[in-house]
């Protein structure tokens, strides 16, 4: 069993290395875009943030920031957002990969809460303890699903982490390739460093909300 597990781990690592090379090429081909968030996207973010703030107030969560992931947005555009409750605005934003399982495509993720599905899961999460990651900046945060659509997240090893080859800038109209995520929200190293700094400074748990 151990040998089989190690072979699988090596294979996954090789696949991700190949994907990394492809992402570098993507970033070179893509048209660079500004850091501004389109008005339509920001309006929906603000609506979600208002609902998120109410949830945080009611459940004793952090009321400085929340993390919002809008999987209805094209994968070549920023769709992970750090929302500043006090400033009522986006503080940081990143590209975000979705899971590749159950016939997900680059343009259309399939969502599932089932172990072994390699799918992203919709719903609210509590961002929990900081731990080592072999990907990105070598840090990840455990996630606990708070709804029926994602309550298997912890035992599925769904975590918030980064991946070094993920571009810092938007690659639209190109999509991010499949294979980067097995269900985890995967973001850029640059934004992960900023997220890590925020989380280390906060005492109360931070809300992460994935929706489409």
Predicted regions and their residues:
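N-terminal Sec-pathway targeting helices
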Residues: 3-17
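Hydrophobic alpha-helical membrane-insertion segments, chiefly the h-region
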Residues: 18-27
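Cell wall/extracellular polymer interaction/catalysis modules
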Residues: 27-182, 189-206
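Charge-dense polyanion-binding interfaces
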Residues: 206-212
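Coiled-coil-like amphipathic alpha-helices with heptad-repeat character
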Residues: 2-3, 23
